[in-house]
Amino acid sequence: LEQAQFLREVRAFDFIARRLWPLLRPVARSHLKPRCRICAAPSAYAPLNADGICNACLQRDTHATADHGPDERLAAEVHATLSAAQGSGSDYDAVFLFSGGKDSCYLLHRLQQDYPGLRILALLVDNGFMSPIALENAASAIAHFDIDFIAFKPDPAFVSRLFGLAFREIPRQQGYSIVDMMDGQLTFDSARNLAAKLEVPLVVCGLGRTQVANIFGGVRAEFSEEDERNPLVARQGLVLEEHFTPGDMRHWFDRTRWPQHGKPRVLMPLVAWDPTEADIIAMVEELGLLRRGHGNPLLTNNAFIPVIAISEVANFGFNSFEVEFSRLIREGRIPLEYWRNLFEMVEYSARTGRFVSTGALEVLERLGLSRQDIGLR
């Protein structure tokens, strides 16, 4: 979409979620399933008790202290890895995956402050579906850091084949969103390939504890070899060569192509540090990197995120993002009412086929998909 139209659609959606949806809910109620009254988790994912509360909320006090704050063991591992990496590469010691969002700005600043000997190359991987606001934010934010920066945009034809295939795999997916995982795989493999070619020992990314737990299961601050496996192979049982051309295959990271020094480790420091949202915002504000009106995730999400959400609800009755965000609601990191409204709006669209945005329809067209391909009427 053109930026002006994109902004109009997002702001209209946001306005409905904030102001109008509570008034529209009674009309839409017959199309909505019950949700946990504490965290908004959908009953299709998390069965509710007689009081309308999911088991995770019933158990939250037991786990509250264990789930929050720095993990000293992981933090020590991260510190040892980053300290040892300083000066150990050829021209760079770490490829840093940069999005321009507040988490990546926070992490990059901490790396520069705490590990001044770490020679960092920032990398933005643009899959062609990034929002114009996210791209603007990244361009504006990177200018505040004295750092080398590369923006990489993979072959659009390959990207279309990849995400078209991933969307068609949604009905067979197990667990977290296969489309979102493949977006991550494209990003991580692009970074690993670059690091391997430049003999850079580390790739550093800004995944947080909740994200890692939801995507991979468990909590760890470094990718294992199993985590590196392509989800189309590991989770969907596909053979990549049957779906991608030899030219396409070069986009995927293959450990066998590289000598030992060309097998970069992938580090996730925020899993160990687990800063609060307030800490992140305070630092980003202090750096002057918080652009007023540009921080809403609806403005910065990839264009296919709403399509994933609608398709998963149509297929399973809930979507992967509800699982992640309901956990954030339980942890007090995001507000219940606003996100419950958003969840219900997506659910209504998925069940009725109504109010599907122009942006979502454009994504389908670019990927060669129909409404029926994603489960819509």
Label every PLM stretch briefly.
Residues A94-D103:
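Short, glycine-rich nucleotide/cofactor-binding loops
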Residues R11-A94, R110, D114-R377:
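Nucleotide-activated chemistry modules centered on ATP-dependent adenylation/adenylyltransferase
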